[in-house]
C-alpha cells in the first residue's frame, strides 16, 4: 500500500461505475482486499525462531492470531467505504440528472405528437377534397374518353369504308384495282396482309351490293371472287414452296395472312393434303406388305398359334409403321407450332385424325382380317398386341405434347388421341361377335386340342359313360339324405347340365379334329385294347403249373404293362390353365367394364374342358378298368395302375382350387355376385369329382374283396386236417396268393395315394379281408397239425398287413392270430385263452364256432371239460 490512510490505486480502479468490482463478487473483492495484510503476518511468523515441535498447524495459527494487527484492515475498509460513499453520491446525482432529462424529453415528444396529429387530420381532409374533385373530373372525362374512342373507331371505320368503296369502285369501273395489286405484290408481308383484309371485306361488300337491277354489280362480284381465289391460290403455292424450302418464317407469314382471310381453312387443308407422308409412293407400296405378312413371315405365324407361347405378340410391320407415324407426328408438331401459332393445336388435331384414317385403320383391318383366316387364337392375340402397341403409342404422344407445351388447357390433342384409339378398337371390342365370341371359341379349341389325344386314346372306354350313370344312380338312391340339401341341389343342377355339356364338347371335338387322323388313332386304340385284353390273360393261374409263378409278378411289371395311363398329366392341365389365364388377362385389359361377366364364362369353359371332359374321361377310364377285371382270369395279379388317374385327378383339383383362389377371385372383389357364383361352381365341380373318385375306390375295394373271396374258395378242406407234418414247411396256396396280392396292393396304392386317402383305402381293404378270413376259418375242420398251418397262413397275412402301418388293422389281424390258437392249445386251456388278450373282446358265438371246428370237438373228454362252458 502507498500509505496507511489511502486506498491502493488498483482497488480504486475497481470502485468506479465503468468497471465496478472488475467482475468480482463482493466476497471475492473483500478477500482480495485483505490478502496483502494477511501475507505480511504470515511472512513475519515464518521468520521467527520457533521450536521445531511448535511448528505444527495449530501452533502457527495461534501465533498468527496473537500477532494479528487489526489497524491496517480497519484503515483499508474505511478507505473503501469512503470511496463507495463517494461513488454512491455521484451515481445518485447522475440518476437525478438523467431523470430530469427524460421527463423534459417526454414532454417535448408529447407536444410533437399532438402537433403531428393535427397536421395529419388536416392532410386527410385535404386528400378527401382532392379525391372528390378527381372523382368529379373522372365522371366528366370518362364519357368523353368513351366518345373519343368511339369517334376514333368511327374515323377508322370511315377511312376503311372510304378505302373499301374506292377499291370496290376500282373493280366496278376497271375490273381491277392497282392499289390492291401493289399491296399483294409487295415484299412486305404486312402489306400483303392488308390486301387480304381488303379482299375479305370486298367479298362481303360485293355480296351485299349485288342486285339484278344493276347487272354490273353481279359481274363485279364475280371479278372480286375470281381475284380473291387467284390471290389465295398464289399464297398457297408460296406456302408449299416455302415448306419445301424449310422457310419457316415465310410459312408463318403466309399462315397469318390466310388465317385473316378465311380462318386458314384452305392452308391447313393444303398443308395436310400435300404432306409427303400421305402422297409418297413408297408409303403406298408398304400397304401391300400387310396383305402378305402371314405368308412371308412363317415364324411369326407359328408364334401366333403356339399354345405354349403366352407373351404379348406384336407384328413387326405394324410396329415399324407406328414408330414411323410417331416420328412424323413429333417432327411435324414442331413445324406446326412455329408456323400456325395459335392454330397449331387444331392443325395437329387434323393431322392426327388423317394419319389414323389413312395410314393406320386400313392396315389395322387388313391385319385382323388375315389373322382370323389363320385361327381364332391368332386373331385375339393380334388384337391384343395391337391394343398394347397403340396404348403405348398414344401415351407416348400425349407425354410429348405436354413436354412441348403445345396442348392447351382443354387437352384437345390428348382427347383426340384417346378418341382415335377408342374408335379404332370399339368396333371390335364392344361387338361380342368380333371379340369375346372369338375368344371363347379360341379357348374351346385350345382345350379340345390339348385333350383330344387323351380322349381319342380312350374312346372305347368312355363310350358308355358307366361312371356317370353310376353317379346319377348314387344321387337318385340318396334323395332324402342328399337331394334336399343345398349341396344335393347343386350336384343335381350340375349333373343335369354335365351330360349335355359333355355331348356338346364331344361334338365339338369331332368337328375340330382331322377325320383321317381321328380314324387312325381310333384304329390304333382298338388294336391296343385288343392286345391289352389278350395280355391280361397271361396272368391266369389255371394255365400255370403252380400259383407260385404269379407271386413273382411285381408292381414294376404292371407299370410297364400296356394298360398304364397315358397322356394324363398335371403338366397338361398346367398348360391349359395358362391358356385360361392368358384369355382372362386379355379380357381384363381389353374390356375391363365387362371383365367380371366374361371371366365367369371363361371359367365355365375351363371347367367344361378340364373337369367335365379331361378329368371325367380319366375317371371313366379308371372305372372302366376296374369294372372289366375278370377275377377268374387274373389270379394272383391285381393291377391298380389306374389309381394314377385318381392321384393325378386329386392333384389337378388342388391346382384348380389354388388357381381359382389366388388368380381369379381377387379379380372379382368388386363383383360379389359373380364371385359367389364362381365359388359355388368350383365347389360343385370339386364335390362331384370327389364323389366319382369315391365310387371308383369303392368299386376297387369291392373287386379286391371279390378277388379274395374267389381265392379263398380254392381252399381245400384237407388243407387243415393233414395226416402228417410234411406240409408244415409252406403256406397254403390261397394264403400265398392273397399275401402276394396284399403286397402288390400296398406297393401300387402307396405310389398313387397319399396320407389319409391311402390309409382309408388300405383300412377298408384290410377290414374286408379280415371279415372274409374270420368267416372263412369258421367253416373248416382243423386238427392239431392243421392249426399250425392256419397259424402260419395268418402270420403271412399279419406280416403283410403290418407293413401297411395301419394300427386298427394290426390289432384285427393280431386278434385273428389269437383265434388260430384256439385250434392248437390243449382243451383245458381254452377257457383261460378266450378271456385274455384280443379274444376277450370277441363275441362268444365266433369263439364257439372256431372251437367247434376242432377235430377233437366231439371227443368225450373234450365235451366233458369244455363244451358245456360255451353253451
Swiss-Prot record:
List of residues that carry Phosphoserine? 142, 485, 507
Q: Quote the subunit structure annotation.
A: The exocyst complex is composed of SEC3, SEC5, SEC6, SEC8, SEC10, SEC15, EXO70 and EXO84.
For this record, the Gene Ontology CC terms, alphabetical, are: cellular bud neck; exocyst; mating projection tip
More about this protein: Present with 2340 molecules/cell in log phase SD medium.
What keywords are assigned to this protein?
Coiled coil, Exocytosis, Phosphoprotein, Protein transport, Transport
Q: Which gene encodes it?
A: SEC10
The record ties this protein, via PANTHER family, to: EXOCYST COMPLEX COMPONENT 5 (PTHR12100:SF0), SEC10 (PTHR12100)
Q: Which family does the UniProt entry place this protein in?
A: Belongs to the SEC10 family.
Give the record's GO biological process terms: exocytosis; Golgi to plasma membrane transport; protein transport; vesicle docking involved in exocytosis
Q: Which residues form a coiled coil?
A: 74-101
Its name, as the record gives it, is Exocyst complex component SEC10
Pfam families referenced in this protein's UniProt entry, alphabetically: Sec10_HB, Sec10_N
* tRNA-binding found in the keyword field: no
- Tell me, in a sentence or two, what this protein's role is: Component of the exocyst complex involved in the docking of exocytic vesicles with fusion sites on the plasma membrane.
Source organism of this protein record: Saccharomyces cerevisiae (strain ATCC 204508 / S288c)
InterPro entries listed in its UniProt record = Sec10-like, Sec10_HB, Sec10_N
Amino acid at each position: 500500500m502507498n500509505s496507511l490512510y489511502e486506498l491502493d490505486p488498483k482497488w480504486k480502479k475497481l470502485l468506479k461505475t465503468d468497471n465496478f468490482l472488475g467482475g468480482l463478487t463482493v466476497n471475492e473483492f473483500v478477500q482480495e482486499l485483505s490478502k496483502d495484510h494477511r501475507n505480511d503476518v504470515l511472512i513475519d511468523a515464518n521468520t521467527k525462531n520457533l521450536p521445531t515441535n511448535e511448528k505444527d498447524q495449530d501452533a502457527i495459527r495461534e501465533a498468527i492470531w496473537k500477532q494479528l494487527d487489526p489497524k491496517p484492515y480497519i484503515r483499508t475498509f474505511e478507505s473503501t467505504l469512503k470511496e463507495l460513499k463517494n461513488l454512491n453520491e455521484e451515481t445518485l446525482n447522475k440518476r437525478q440528472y438523467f431523470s430530469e432529462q427524460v421527463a423534459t424529453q417526454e414532454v417535448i415528444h408529447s407536444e410533437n405528437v399532438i402537433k403531428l396529429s393535427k397536421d395529419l387530420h388536416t392532410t386527410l381532409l385535404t386528400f378527401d377534397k382532392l379525391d372528390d374533385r378527381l372523382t368529379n373530373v373522372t365522371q366528366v372525362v370518362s364519357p368523353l374518353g368513351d366518345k373519343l374512342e368511339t369517334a376514333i373507331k368511327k374515323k377508322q371505320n370511315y377511312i376503311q369504308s372510304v378505302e373499301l368503296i374506292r377499291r370496290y369502285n376500282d373493280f366496278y369501273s376497271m375490273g381491277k384495282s392497282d392499289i390492291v395489286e401493289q399491296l399483294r405484290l409487295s415484299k412486305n408481308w404486312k402489306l400483303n396482309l392488308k390486301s387480304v383484309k381488303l379482299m375479305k371485306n370486298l367479298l362481303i361488300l360485293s355480296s351485299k351490293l349485288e342486285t339484278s337491277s344493276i347487272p354490273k354489280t353481279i359481274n363485279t362480284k364475280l371479278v372480286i371472287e375470281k381475284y380473291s381465289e387467284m390471290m389465295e391460290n398464289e399464297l398457297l403455292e408460296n406456302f408449299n414452296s416455302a415448306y419445301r424450302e424449310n422457310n419457316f418464317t415465310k410459312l408463318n407469314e403466309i399462315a397469318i395472312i390466310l388465317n385473316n382471310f378465311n380462318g386458314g381453312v384452305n392452308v391447313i387443308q393444303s398443308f395436310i393434303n400435300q404432306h409427303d407422308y400421305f402422297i409418297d409412293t413408297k408409303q403406298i407400296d408398304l400397304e401391300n406388305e400387310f396383305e402378305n405378312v402371314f405368308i412371308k413371315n412363317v415364324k411369326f405365324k407359328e408364334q401366333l398359334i403356339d399354345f405354349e407361347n403366352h407373351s404379348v405378340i406384336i407384328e413387326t410391320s405394324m410396329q415399324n409403321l407406328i414408330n414411323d407415324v410417331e416420328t412424323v407426328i413429333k417432327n411435324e408438331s414442331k413445324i406446326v407450332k412455329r408456323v400456325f401459332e395459335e392454330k397449331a393445336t387444331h392443325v395437329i388435331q387434323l393431322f392426327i385424325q388423317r394419319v389414323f384414317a389413312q395410314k393406320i385403320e386400313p392396315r389395322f383391318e387388313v391385319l385382323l382380317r388375315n389373322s382370323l383366316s389363320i385361327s381364332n387364337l391368332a386373331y385375339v392375340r393380334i388384337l391384343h398386341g395391337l391394343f398394347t402397341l397403340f396404348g403405348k403409342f398414344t401415351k407416348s404422344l400425349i407425354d410429348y405434347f405436354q413436354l412441348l407445351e403445345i396442348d392447351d388447357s382443354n387437352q384437345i390433342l390428348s382427347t383426340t388421341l384417346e378418341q382415335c384409339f377408342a374408335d379404332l378398337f370399339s368396333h371390335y371390342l364392344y361387338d361380342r361377335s368380333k371379340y369375346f365370341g372369338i375368344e371363347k371359341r379360341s379357348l374351346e379349341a385350345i382345350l379340345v386340342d390339348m385333350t383330344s389325344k387323351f380322349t381319342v386314346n380312350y374312346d372305347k372306354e368312355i363310350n358308355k359313360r358307366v361312371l356317370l350313370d353310376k353317379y346319377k344312380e348314387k344321387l337318385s338312391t340318396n334323395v332324402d339324405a342328399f337331394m334336399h340339401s343345398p349341396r344335393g341341389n347343386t350336384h343335381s343342377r350340375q349333373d343335369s347340365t354335365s351330360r349335355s355339356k359333355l355331348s356338346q364338347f364331344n361334338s365339338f371335338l369331332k368337328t375340330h379334329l382331322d377325320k383321317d387322323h381321328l380314324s387312325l388313332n381310333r384304329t390304333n386304340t382298338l388294336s391296343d385294347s385288343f392286345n391289352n385284353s389278350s395280355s391280361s390273360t397271361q396272368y391266369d393261374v389255371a394255365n400255370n403249373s403252380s400259383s407260385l409263378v404269379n407271386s413273382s409278378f411285381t408292381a414294376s411289371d404292371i407299370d410297364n404293362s400296356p394298360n398304364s395311363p397315358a397322356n394324363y398329366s398335371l403338366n397338361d392341365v398346367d398348360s391349359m390353365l395358362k391358356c385360361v389365364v392368358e384369355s382372362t388377362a386379355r379380357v381384363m385389359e381389353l374390356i375391363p367394364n365387362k371383365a367380371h361377366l366374361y371371366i365367369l364364362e371363361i371359367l365355365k369353359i375351363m371347367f367344361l374342358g378340364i373337369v367335365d371332359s379331361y378329368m371325367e374321361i380319366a375317371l371313366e377310364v379308371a372305372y372302366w378298368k376296374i369294372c372289366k377285371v375278370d377275377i377268374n382270369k387274373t389270379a394272383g395279379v391285381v393291377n391298380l395302375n389306374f389309381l394314377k388317374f385318381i392321384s393325378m385327378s386329386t392333384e389337378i383339383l388342388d391346382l384348380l382350387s389354388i388357381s381359382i383362389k389366388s388368380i381369379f377371385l381377387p379379380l372379382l372383389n368388386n363383383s360379389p355376385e359373380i364371385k359367389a357364383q364362381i365359388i359355388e361352381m368350383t365347389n360343385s365341380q370339386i364335390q362331384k369329382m370327389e364323389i366319382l373318385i369315391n365310387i371308383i375306390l369303392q368299386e376297387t375295394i369291392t373287386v379286391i374283396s371279390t378277388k379274395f373271396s374267389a381265392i379263398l374258395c380254392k381252399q381245400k378242406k384237407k388243407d387243415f386236417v393233414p395226416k402228417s407234418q410234411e406240409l408244415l414247411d409252406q403256406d397254403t396256396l390261397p394264403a400265398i396268393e392273397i399275401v402276394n396280392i396284399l403286397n402288390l396292393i400296398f406297393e401300387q396304392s402307396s405310389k398313387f395315394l397319399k396320407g389319409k386317402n391311402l390309409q382309408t383305402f388300405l383300412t377298408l381293404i384290410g377290414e374286408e379281408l379280415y371279415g372274409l378270413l374270420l368267416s372263412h376259418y369258421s367253416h373248416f375242420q382243423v386238427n392239431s397239425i392243421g392249426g399250425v398251418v392256419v397259424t402260419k397262413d395268418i402270420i403271412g397275412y399279419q406280416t403283410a398287413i403290418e407293413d401297411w402301418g395301419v394300427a386298427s388293422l394290426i390289432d384285427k389281424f393280431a386278434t385273428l392270430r389269437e383265434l388260430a390258437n384256439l385250434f392248437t392249445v390243449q382243451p383245458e386251456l381254452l377257457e383261460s385263452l378266450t378271456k385274455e388278450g384280443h379274444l376277450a373282446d370277441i363275441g362268444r358265438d365266433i369263439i364257439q364256432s372256431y372251437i367247434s371246428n376242432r377235430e377233437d370237438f366231439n371227443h368225450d373228454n373234450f365235451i366233458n371239460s369244455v363244451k358245456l362252458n360255451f353253451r
